[in-house]
């Protein structure tokens, strides 16, 4: 399993979306998220977007007022994860006008289409958007 978790955090440090692919006890998640978020938000824009945390890496990218944070195994390719984040952001931009907070179920669904059990399974923006549009058109 390469990806351990995927977090979407605002610039105030509040978690807006979290998806875990590794079993982390629910009671430990807030403290862990808080520490990781602090590490990422305290870094300057000229610093590297990769941070070592315990026995894995944290890869993050800032878009507007949101931080996309992904925890991965130490063997995972950092650039591939940055590309995954960028692809996810492009798909979210295609699906939502500005605010995704009113459609978190759809944001989770899109992420589930891209990542399954910690592995990247789909990166085609076109395929994901076709499936999302088909599913949500039926509602």
Curated annotation (Swiss-Prot):
Broad class of the protein's primary localization: Golgi
SUPFAM superfamilies the UniProt entry points to: SNARE-like (SSF64356)
UniProt-listed Pfam families: Clat_adaptor_s
Statement: the UniProt record of this protein carries the keyword Lipoprotein: no
Membrane topology listed for this record: Peripheral membrane protein
Places the protein is found: Golgi apparatus, trans-Golgi network membrane
Functional note: Probable component of an adaptor protein complex. Adaptor protein complexes are vesicle coat components involved both in vesicle formation and cargo selection. They control the vesicular transport of proteins in different trafficking pathways.
Similarity comment: family membership: Belongs to the adaptor complexes small subunit family.
Quaternary structure and partners: May be part of the adaptor protein complex 4 (AP-4), a heterotetramer composed of two large adaptins (epsilon-type subunitand beta-type subunit), a medium adaptin (mu-type subunit) and a small adaptin (sigma-type).
Protein name, per record: AP-4 complex subunit sigma
Lineage: Eukaryota, Amoebozoa, Evosea, Eumycetozoa, Dictyostelia
